């Protein structure tokens, strides 16, 4: 358990609680001693605003191991500072609340920034990296670098596994440049060529300009669904537009043809099915034409029909009625009002009409007309059933 500098009591746990925050006083740093001297005598140095601005400037300059102030210090002052940083790693936190210090620290990879969970960070709202944001204090502007982040780095947050940092390139030193006083940031570690993506996030990928030259990898391996890879590839690739699919023209590596190749076949099938439906109707019409048409033979008129035929014009002239039902009722009343002798005349005319009809159509029977109606109904039913059969099959093909 760390002890207070100058405090007595050795390692006695009764002097302080285990959860108490213990401040440490840095020794041997002239810059910090100057700050503590200014804090202890505020009335001599000026108002409170100048002290706060100097504190902000010092807190932003001192933790940066590669800044201008560290280079200007002597080597003897740098060594105890680094030793102190190894002993107390909490003092080197970034003043913005530890944006880049949430993950585990790797001492051998000082040039890299570890970002294990980007979605839980309050600074990253959508889980994506933001461009370098210039932060301006009262006097010194400080720029937060993005450290050459790969454009597909936001996709890493979908997987729970953290990528190990790559090996440090030997030809690029990560130490401080003595001429400019700025650190050389090594390039980011190589991103693996395969990312496990979620199905909902595939359609939101916008590839950069330099992604066109890279090889295309199948996306179906990252999905963990029970259905086969061909179906998942079809659903995922359908969300890409034509200009977003990289690589040379030709069939995809997943075995799915380009949408421009698939759609013409479907368009060619539809006219074929329509032509089949058009050919169904002429076949029924040709069958009707081939059958010999029998003329509809009317049955011979009886006595009442002959009377109606003769007296209809007189009733229409006498009455203003134009409805046939009302005219037929009037003619029926008048027919029943006739005497037997008057009706006998019309019965004789009806008998002659039947004889003439038998001479003209010797084998005719009244059943032929009624049988034709039944035949027509049967043909209509057969046409409707046979017509819907091919139509339904053509629709499902």
Curated annotation (Swiss-Prot):
DNA-binding region: 297-365
Outcome when changing residue 26 to A: Prevents nuclear translocation of CTNNB1
Tissue specificity field: Expressed in Vgamma1.1 and Vgamma2 gamma-delta T-cells, however not expressed in gamma-delta thymocytes fated for Il17a expression (at protein level). Expressed in alpha-beta T-cell lineages. Expressed in the thymus. Found in distinct epithelial cell compartments of the skin and is abundant in the hair-producing progenitors of the follicle.
Subcellular location: Nucleus
GO cellular component terms attached to this protein's record: beta-catenin-TCF complex; cytoplasm; nucleoplasm; nucleus; protein-DNA complex; RNA polymerase II transcription regulator complex; transcription regulator complex
Region (CTNNB1-binding): 1-60
Location of Phosphothreonine modifications: 153
Domain notes for this protein: Proline-rich and acidic regions are implicated in the activation functions of RNA polymerase II transcription factors.
Protein name: Lymphoid enhancer-binding factor 1
Taxonomic source organism: Mus musculus (Mouse)
